[in-house]
C-alpha cells in the first residue's frame, strides 16, 4: 500500500489541535440521480445494514435503488431551501459558531471543521485537509448523542480507514456519545421550556428517536437504553411524571421488527386513548433534517390529526441555538483536557532541519 504523506509539510509549520464535527450526510440535490448516489453509499455500509453482502447487494441494486431515489427526491424537495439541505446548513452554522468560540479562546492553535459520513464533504477529504494544516492532535465529535454502531460506530470505521492509509497519524480522541452529558440535557430541556412559554403544554410530550432493527439491541447495541436515559433525564429536569411523556422510534425501513413503540403507530392510536394534543421532540437529531421536518413535522402530524387529534406541535432540533453551541463547546473542552500546542520556535526548527539536510 502507498501511504498518503503531507506534501505541504515544512518545519516552520506550527502544530495545531483539530476538532472534527461529523454528521450523517445529505444528497447534493433533491434529484433522483443525487439520491441514488447518496443512498448507494449509505445503504452499502455494513454497519447500517447487517445483512449478508451478496443478498443485500441484490436487494439494494435490483430493487431499492430503482424505486426509492425518486420517492426520496420528492420528500427532499419539500424541505430543500435556498441554502440547500437543512442538515448541511445547520451543521455549517454549528461548526462556524464553534470555530468562532475556539478562535476567541485559542487563536489559530485550534482548527474546527465538519465532515459528513456519506456524501460531501467527506471525512477523508476534511481529515486530510486538517492534517495538512498542521493538526497533530485530532478530536472527533459525531453529532449523535446516543451511541449506535450504525452511526457513531460507522463514523469511527470511516476515520480509521482514512488513518489506515495515512503515513503520519495524529493523536486521536473520539467522543462516542454524550446522551447523559448535563449541558446537553439542559439544552434539550431548555428548548422545551422555551416552546412551552409560547405555546403552553400539550397532553403528552413525545421523545421520538430514529429507530434501529431490534436485533441490533439484542446483539448488544446500547442505543435503545441511551435514548430512554436521555428522555428520563430531560423529563426529570422538566419535572414531568411518567404519564406526561413517552418515548417512540421512527423511520423504520424494511419488514423486520425495529425498536418499539413505533412513532407512527403511536400517534394513530393516542386520540382514541383520550390524548388530543401532543408535542414532539427529536433529541437524537442535533440538526433538523428530512426525518424531523418532513417525517415528524408533516407526515406524522397528518396521522395524528386524521386519527382524531386536535393539536400537534413539533419542537425544532437544537441546531445552532446558543445553549446547544455552549453544550457542544463544553463537551469539546472536556475532551481536549491535557492537550496543548507547544509554543515552539518554528524558525529554529526549520534552521536545525536545514542544517541536517532537510529541504522543508
Curated annotation (Swiss-Prot):
Pathway(s): Porphyrin-containing compound metabolism; protoheme biosynthesis; protoheme from protoporphyrin-IX: step 1/1
Example GO biological process: heme biosynthetic process
Metal-binding as UniProt keyword: yes
Main location: cytoplasm
GO terms for cellular component: cytoplasm
Keyword Lyase: yes
CDD domains: Ferrochelatase_C, Ferrochelatase_N
PROSITE patterns for the chain: FERROCHELATASE
Record's keyword terms, sorted: Cytoplasm, Heme biosynthesis, Iron, Lyase, Metal-binding, Porphyrin biosynthesis
A GO term, aspect molecular function: ferrochelatase activity
EC number: 4.98.1.1
EC class (word): lyase
Localization: Cytoplasm
Stored Pfam families: Ferrochelatase (PF00762)
Gene3D superfamilies per record: 3.40.50.1400
List of residues binding Fe cation: 210, 291
Catalysis performed (reactions): heme b + 2 H(+) = protoporphyrin IX + Fe(2+)
Function: Catalyzes the ferrous insertion into protoporphyrin IX.
Family: Belongs to the ferrochelatase family.
Record-given protein name: Ferrochelatase
Origin species: Pseudoalteromonas atlantica (strain T6c / ATCC BAA-1087)
Organism lineage: Bacteria, Pseudomonadati, Pseudomonadota, Gammaproteobacteria, Alteromonadales
Amino acid at each position: 500500500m502507498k501511504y498518503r504523506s503531507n506534501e505541504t509539510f515544512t518545519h516552520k509549520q506550527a502544530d495545531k489541535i483539530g476538532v472534527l464535527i461529523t454528521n450523517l450526510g445529505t444528497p447534493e440535490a433533491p434529484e433522483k440521480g443525487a439520491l441514488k448516489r447518496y443512498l448507494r453509499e449509505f445503504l452499502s455500509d455494513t454497519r447500517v445494514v447487517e445483512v449478508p453482502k451478496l443478498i443485500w447487494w441484490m436487494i439494494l441494486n435490483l430493487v431499492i435503488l430503482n424505486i426509492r431515489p425518486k420517492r426520496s427526491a420528492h420528500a427532499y424537495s419539500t424541505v430543500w431551501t435556498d441554502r440547500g439541505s437543512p442538515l448541511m446548513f445547520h451543521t455549517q452554522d454549528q461548526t462556524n459558531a464553534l470555530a468562532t468560540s475556539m478562535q476567541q479562546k485559542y487563536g489559530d492553535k485550534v482548527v474546527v471543521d465538519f465532515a459528513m459520513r456519506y456524501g460531501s464533504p467527506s471525512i477523508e477529504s476534511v481529515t486530510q485537509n486538517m492534517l495538512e494544516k498542521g493538526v497533530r492532535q485530532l478530536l472527533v465529535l459525531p453529532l449523535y448523542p446516543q451511541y449506535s454502531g450504525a452511526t457513531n460506530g460507522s463514523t469511527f470505521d470511516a476515520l480509521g480507514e482514512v488513518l489506515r492509509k495515512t503515513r503520519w497519524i495524529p493523536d486521536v480522541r473520539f467522543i462516542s456519545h454524550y446522551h447523559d452529558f448535563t449541558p446537553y440535557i439542559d439544552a434539550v430541556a431548555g428548548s422545551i421550556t422555551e416552546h412551552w412559554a409560547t405555546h403552553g403544554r400539550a397532553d403528552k410530550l413525545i421523545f421520538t428517536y430514529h429507530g434501529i432493527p431490534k436485533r441490533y439491541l439484542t446483539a448488544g447495541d446500547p442505543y435503545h437504553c441511551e435514548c430512554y436515559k436521555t428522555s428520563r433525564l430531560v423529563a426529570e429536569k422538566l419535572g414531568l411524571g411518567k404519564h406526561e411523556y413517552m418515548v417512540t422510534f421512527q423511520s423504520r425501513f424494511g419488514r423486520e421488527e425495529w425498536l418499539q413503540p413505533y412513532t407512527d403507530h403511536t400517534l394513530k392510536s393516542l386520540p382514541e386513548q383520550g390524548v388530543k394534543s401532543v408535542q414532539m421532540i427529536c433529541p437524537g437529531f442535533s440538526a433538523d433534517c428530512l426525518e424531523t421536518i418532513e417525517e415528524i413535522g408533516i407526515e406524522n402530524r397528518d396521522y395524528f390529526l386524521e386519527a382524531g387529534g386536535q393539536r400537534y406541535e413539533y419542537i425544532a432540533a437544537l441546531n445552532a441555538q446558543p445553549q446547544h453551541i455552549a453544550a457542544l463547546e463544553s463537551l469539546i473542552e472536556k475532551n481536549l483536557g491535557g492537550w496543548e500546542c507547544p509554543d515552539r520556535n518554528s524558525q529554529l526548527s526549520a534552521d536545525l532541519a536545514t542544517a541536517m539536510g532537510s529541504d522543508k
